[in-house]
Amino acid sequence: MSKRQSFYQFLMTERNPDSTDEIAQFANNAFYDQSFPKQADDYDSLSQYLELNGTYLPSMVIFDNAWTKYEEFMS
């Protein structure tokens, strides 16, 4: 069985510097966040990190939408 992909690894597949899509912009900004928890794959730790440090994320709804896509991708 393969190892579960981290949320960050998934999020990097959504990067697109030319896109105005909110998830793409989140991914672009997370790429430059050197403290982003790159190995995390659980909602609570990522949510807590972003609430405290994700000044580049205008709304936690964007994270929630990205998390839903991540869960769909992982299932």
Curated annotation (Swiss-Prot):
Annotated SUPFAM superfamilies = YozE-like
Its domain of life? Bacteria
Spell out the family assignment given in the record's similarity comment.
Belongs to the UPF0346 family.
Fetch the NCBIfam families from UniProt: PRK13672.1
Please give the name of this protein. Answer: UPF0346 protein LSL_0716
Organism from which the protein derives: Ligilactobacillus salivarius (strain UCC118) (Lactobacillus salivarius)
